[in-house]
Structure formats: C-alpha cells, structure tokens
C-alpha cells in the first residue's frame, strides 16, 4: 500500500491539465501509440469541442520510478471552470495530494486559487508545477512569486515542464512519488468505500467510481449502500487505465469501479459510503457538501409528446451530475416541462446541449432567474425562483435578492475597465490587493447581474486576462419589480423577469425592441408591451403585412377606393380578435441577451 499515490490536478481553464494527463498516460504505457489521441480523458464530444473538462475522470497508471519500485498512480482529472467546482471538491475527497498546474506565461488565476484553498482545507499536499515552459512568454520567476504571494505555498523548487513537448514530465512524476503521501487505511478492517461518481450504463446498470478507504471488495461480495440500506451483489470490479480493465479485487487505498447490477437510477448516490452486508454498522465517510443550484430556468419540450422521454433523460443525467435539480412545472405559453436548477450559465448550456444530443430532444429554455427571498406581510418568509410564481405586490413586505462575493484577479492595466463593469452591475467594492503585476479585487454583486452575462463581459473588457471566482454570501433588501411582457394584451408567463426598479424602464424598452425583431410579421398588427404591475413602460408594434387592395382601381372615384380600404380594415380588425401569435424559440432566449 505504500506504493500507491492518489492525486488530482488543479488548474485554471486552458492551463494544460488535460494535456499533462495525456503525457502521464503515454509515459506509463496506458495506451498504445495507435489509441493515443489528444485529451484522452475528455470523452464527451462536448468536452472536446469546447476544449474544457466537465466531468471528473479517473485513471490508474503504473509508473516505474528511478529507485526501481513500480508505483500505482490513481489520478483523477478535474474540471477548471467556476461552474464545476463541486466536481473538483468530489475528486479531492478521494486524494492525498494535488498538483497545482500553472501556466508559466499567464500566472495564477482566480479559479485555481479557489480550488487550491479547497485542497488545503481538506488537508491535501499541494505540489506546484509550472507548465508551458516552452512558450516564449514564459516567466517562471514572476509566476513562482505569484504562487507564494497569492496562494501562500512555497514554490521555490516548483517543477518546470511542458506537457505539449513532454519536457520535464518524468521529473514531475518523480517529484510526485516523493512528495505526495501514501494512503492510510487497513486491508483487514471492514470495507469502507466512498462513491466519487456514478453513471448509468444501459447494459450494466449503475457504474460507480469508488475510493476504497479500508478493507477490500471483490466479485461476488454482497455490498450495502449506506443511505438507501439496500443490498447488491457485486458483478465486477476493476480500474480504468484508461480503458475498463477488470481486476480481482479493490484494496484499501485504491480507486476503481464497482458494477453491482443496480438498476434503480438513485441506487448509488454520489458521496455515499459502501460497505459489506456482513458489517452494516461501519461509520459513514464524510462526503462532500451538496452544492445548491444558483440559477433556475424552465426547460420545455417543443412537442408535448416528448415529455416522458424528457423526464427519463433528466433522471439519467441527474445520476451523473448530482448538482442538477428539477421539478415539474407547467406554463400557459409552453405547456408541461421542468423547472431545473443549475450551478451557472455554462452548466445550463451544457446540460441543454447534452439533453439535445445524447437524448435527441428539442427543448425551449426560458430566461434563467435566481432565488429571491420574500418577507410577506403575514410575517412568513418564502423563496421564489420563478417570476410567474411571484405573489401580489400588495402582500409583500420586503423583497431580498441574493448577493455574491466575487473575487476577481486582473492585470493592473485592465483594472479600470473591470471596476466600471462592476459599478454598472450595481457592485459594491469590498477590498483590493496589489500582488505583483496583478490586482485582486473583491466585490459584492447581485447574483441576478452575475448570472446573465457577467463572465463574458468581464472577459471582453479585460481582453481575456481577468479571472473570476464567486460564492453566495447573503440575501439583501432591494427595490425589485416584476416586468411582464404582453403580446396583443395577453401576458406571456414564460417571458416575465424580476428586475431592479432603476433598470426596469430600460430593460422593458430593450426587451420590446428585441421582440419586435424576432416575432414574424402577421396579417394583423401585433402589439408588444412591457408592464410593471398595471403600468405600461414600453411598447412596440410589429406592423401587419397588407395586400394592396387598390391595385385594380385605375383612377375612378375616391369613394370606391375608400370602400375597399374600409373593408380591408374591418377584416384586419376581425383577424386580430381571433388570431394568435406563434412565438419563436429565439424570442424566449432574447431575454438573456439584453445588452
């Protein structure tokens, strides 16, 4: 057991952790030359296209060190994007150490700082590695200083390497074997294993990735899932290297998969403890905190026949992604669907794309909202995540919106633009630290403003150099109103928004203008209005298409022309009373893209 090392890699987006993982796999002979491809571990098509890691993946490699001992390296790849921090905390719970990979040209970024603190809090040994040393703009001394100043770990002897060219990678492995502690645990004790991840396979049922703390598990054992109390027979155990490879057993300290023919999707929840049926009173391992969704949006199938398939697809996805939550809801405009909770906008986009790709569904998404806290005049407090569920304003004593504490790391030359952006988003500055060439500013921002387009705007005002990390802080009273959209004097519930009163007029005007471009012209005028309560704050009209009824009158009396025009007018009026307007999918998304 002293020859096992469990570790994961912490890095910001695009600092090269998936490429470094490829090098490890290549050096330890996990795959033949023919099977080797870039970013082996990013197995989802979506991950390859966007060039980001979404799910945590695990690999077991055997590395023969210079001292002649062969070490078993269990390596768990983690995502770097702020929306997927919970995936990172799960991976870290299964490790004894972490590699902090920093791009030697760009330096430390906010996301790696946040993940690094998580690792240190969980008592992991953090080992800094400078990547991309082959680039001309690499400046190792500045970056080492940044690591020490911002994160506060000693980086004087950080290993320098380049994952792309393969330079220094063996040095990284040698250092890893030396600095990261071996797992503790006892093979003779009763089985205790932590579920790091699970996913649903149509043939095998639930496949769980586990880290064994104590004891051992082999094929034919009866295992007990602590939270459900159900017993299952183990069909097979094994490791990924990176292909599925069955082994005789999994022993204390190892990371691998267990297949036990669990057909119920919620049969092996992530973060749960497994043990043998003979020792049911083993302590539950400390899991990791369930992260609450920050953003809610309605998802509706375009055709109502897909509703059942949609429900099934959501169930399978929740198994694999424990942070996704959903409840059924119905809308007058869109029919039946689900109200889903996500961690952020990227998470929402990715879930929607996975549903459309992997399960062939056509979906309509409504505008995302956050949870508001309302104090009613009766004295009770309620939480609302859907603008159409907002009670009557006369019954509300106080409305509070969620505030996030955002930490932004930005080079000094872009600081001014970032501050302007934060003020525009109603932010309040908390503090500012100058660290070498970078500045760390922290702001209290309304989550409503952060959720929609803050990340994209931040990247564009800082030319891509600023990085962001945020977490929920508190609820705070705010002057909020509900903005309704009326089309031909009928409210469309799926387009309602909750906005700050100061921005309401501007938002209403922008929204009606945008709708005007997207709603196709009909045979009658379509009035688009934005209203706060009973007061209309903005209006535009989509003009009717009309036939030239005077084409057949050459000259002739004016009363003849008037008769034809009056007749057309009466027809249009009648049409407007019975006609209904089809609202295209783009119109629902327009709410997101209000500049």
Curated annotation (Swiss-Prot):
It catalyses: GTP + H2O = GDP + phosphate + H(+). It is found in: Cell inner membrane. GO terms for molecular function: GTP binding; GTPase activity; guanosine tetraphosphate binding; ribosome binding; translation elongation factor activity. One of its GO terms (biological process) is positive regulation of translation. GTP binds at residues 14-19, 131-134. GO terms for cellular component: plasma membrane. InterPro entries: EF-4, EFG_III/V, EFG_V-like, EFTu-like_2, LepA_C_sf, LepA_CTD, LepA_IV, P-loop_NTPase. Keywords: Cell inner membrane, Cell membrane, GTP-binding, Hydrolase, Membrane, Nucleotide-binding, Protein biosynthesis. Gene3D superfamilies: 3.30.70.240, Elongation factor 4, C-terminal domain (3.30.70.2570), Elongation Factor G (Translational Gtpase), domain 3 (3.30.70.870), P-loop containing nucleotide triphosphate hydrolases (3.40.50.300), Translation factors (2.40.30.10). The keyword Repressor does not apply. Residues 2-184 form the tr-type G domain. Required for accurate and efficient protein synthesis under certain stress conditions. May act as a fidelity factor of the translation reaction, by catalyzing a one-codon backward translocation of tRNAs on improperly translocated ribosomes. Back-translocation proceeds from a post-translocation (POST) complex to a pre-translocation (PRE) complex, thus giving elongation factor G a second chance to translocate the tRNAs correctly. Binds to ribosomes in a GTP-dependent manner. PANTHER family: TRANSLATION FACTOR GUF1 HOMOLOG, CHLOROPLASTIC, TRANSLATION FACTOR GUF1-RELATED. Belongs to the TRAFAC class translation factor GTPase superfamily. Classic translation factor GTPase family. LepA subfamily. This is Elongation factor 4. The gene is lepA.
